[in-house]
């Protein structure tokens, strides 16, 4: 796909204009599905093998694992299924995990260790474990030369300003913030060189194939957090 491509630029909306040779977090995703045996939770609990217990043990083991992971590791999860009624021992439960770190090799080893946590949960509860690998992405490989060119052009082209209606809208949005950022920051370009973003992106995979750099532009009200309703309100 990128064989004839000299360079790749990627863009992301933001509350600020920014460019630089910034990296990201590598990530692996996995779903642990446990299958046990249903039973009446009060009438015959000894007959049940709780898939939810297996999820809870997996999560507890993962919490203990955090203490013994390298700096900048991020492990987070959601329980997708945990039973339907408290009077029934859950025969099926599922938990979804993300593992992140600035180094993809570290992520792979953390994934191995997290699978051991799930295996322990299944062993302790006599349930069956299915490991559903959901994919992985590498960290962005920074390219300083491209980043400098992008930042220079972004500064030359940046001529943002708010009209009266836009200013009034921005001020209303900022009333919902705990910390306000001057609206004049839309005229600035932040240098992100040498930093590591807290997110993960498949652009990371691309960056290991072809020279890649990225930038963001001020599409939201200054001070807006990503993945928030304020970001959506900005359109």
Q: How should each PLM-predicted stretch be described?
A:
Residues 3-166, 171-177:
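Midchain, well-structured core segments that form catalytic/ion-binding scaffolds
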Residues 167-235:
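Zn-dependent metallopeptidase/amidohydrolase metal-coordination segment
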Residues 1, 50, 143, 202-205, ...:
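Poly-acidic low-complexity segments
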